[in-house]
Each structure stands twice: as structure tokens, then as C-alpha cells.
Amino acid sequence: MAALITSNFTMPQEYAAGVFKKAQSTSALAQLSGAMPQKFGKTNVMVLTSAPKAEIVAEGGEKSPTPTAYANKTISPIKLQVTARVSNEVMWADEDYQMGILSDVGENCGIALGRALDIVGIHKANPLTGAVAASVTEGLCDATDKAQLAGTKFDEAIEAASGLVIANGYTPTGIACDPALSFGLATMRDTTGRRIYPELGYGQGVASFEGMTAAVSDTVSGKELTKASDIIGLVGQFDAFRWGVQREIAMHTIEFGDPDGLGDLQRLNQVAIRAEIVYGIGILDLKAFAKVVKAAA
């Protein structure tokens, strides 16, 4: 196979009108835990597991040891790519129409890479296949603490999950909600029929709840997964989830070769558009998180 020949592709600052795109949610984890600068490759992070304690020392008295323990946690690189093909006819269209289509493809590649952070970080899955990836060894789905929804008592489930996080010595700073959880919470009513949380609207743009930062995305339940998840929410101290961009490979067009196994581009009169990113992902302590899971069937 001939070597791929690529050329840079610069997206415009504003996307051309006339292209309809179904709205897609972005990464909840990115909203709740800020990215940290990282170098490429596996990185070890020292995590304090036993804090030192101060001691009163009498005049002339001896000082006792104050043990402190640390553990190593690994931040692992995860490479992700999105490749989309378009026909040469699209490339030959007039400039306004062409840039509208390509900008739309580019934006959706970015959305896919954003969603991938959640699918990998929460569910340990390959976003393309929906199956658990053997290369991903840890995800927030592995948290053992969980609160199960009872009927429609969404707020009580969140409260219970928050209590589990607090009992483990952490502070619940954020909540990642599936739209089913945020909508259920937003439409709860008291005994008189009045909405309990009218400020939440219909739960699609929730930014905070009970002092916690909130993010809503269907990546929390993982609609891409081949095996359905029962997770509808994650409560936790989200600085215990570490992520960053180790390498961001600019979007580019590929005009020659077979970059995705679907056939030679020149033979099929097509051009491929590719975007790639390398995330570094790690969880310092799963005890900093508690899941909110669906009610029993």
C-alpha cells in the first residue's frame, strides 16, 4: 500500500449556514474536572493514602515518628481517532457549500472525541464498537459505592450517593447526570403538584445542584455501549479524576491510500478527513465517587 499523503486542513472560525446537525451532548467529565498539562506516555502520580498527624512535644521530650503513606497511580495514554470520508463531488462544489459541509464534519469529529473521554473514562469502552476495551484497565464504572433509585425519588438517590462520598472522606464537588436523571429531578413534584426544583427547567441545561457543579450528558449512561449500563449519575470529588491532552493532532485531509480499510481513496473518488487526540486518563481513588443507578426492574 502506498504511503498516505496528507495536507493540512484549516477550519473556519464560523461554520457556514445551511447544514443541519443533530445536537449532541459533550463530555461531562471535561466539564466537572479541568484538564491538566501532561507529557506523552504513562505518568505516575503520588497519592497521599495516610496523612501525617501532629504531636505535642514536651520541653526536652522526644519526638515520635509521624508515619505518612503514599501510593502510585498511573495516568495512561489513550489514543483516539475519527475518520470520515466525503466524495470528490463535495470537494468540487463551490467554496461556500464545500466549507459548510467540511466544517460540519470537522465539528462532529470534535464532538466525537469529546464524547470519547466519557465513554473511556466512565465505561472503559471503545466508542466505535461499544465494547469494553482491554487496554483500559480502570473507569468510574468500577466505583463500588452506589445509591439505587427508588421509584421517582431522584433527589434522595443523589443525597445517598453524596453521603457515601462524604463517608469516604471526600467532598462531593460535582454530579454527572444522564438526561433521564436530570429530567426526572427537574420534574419532581410535591404533594400539592408543585415542582420542587423549578429552577432546573427540564433538566437539559443544569449547571449546578445543591451546591455541586452539574453536567448533563447521555455519555453517563453510555448509549454507545453494547452492554447496557445501569448508571444514570455519578457524584464525586472530581479532581480525583485526572485527564489531559497529551497530543492533539490537527485535523487533516487524506487524498491517497486506504486510511481506514474501506478501499483506495483515488479509486473510489473520495477524500478522508481525520482528527486524532491522545488523552491521559487516570483515577486517583475510586472511593471519591459514588454511582447513582437505575431503580430495580
Model-derived segments and spans:
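Short, Lys/Arg-rich flexible segments
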Residues: 2-31, 89-96, 114-122, 127, ...
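Assembly/oligomerization interface modules of large self-assembling protein complexes
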Residues: 2-83, 288
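Short loop/turn segments at secondary-structure transitions that flank enzyme active sites
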Residues: 51-53, 81, 90, 115, ...
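Short helix/loop capping segments that flank catalytic or ligand/cofactor-binding pockets
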Residues: 53-56, 94-95, 184-187, 282-284
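Alpha-helical scaffold segments that mediate packing/assembly in large oligomeric complexes
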Residues: 85-168, 291-292, 296-297
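Residues immediately flanking
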Residues: 86-88, 179, 275
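Extended oligomerization regions of viral-like shell subunits
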Residues: 148, 152-255, 260-264, 277
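Extended, compositionally biased alpha-helical segments that mediate assembly or anchoring
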Residues: 256-297
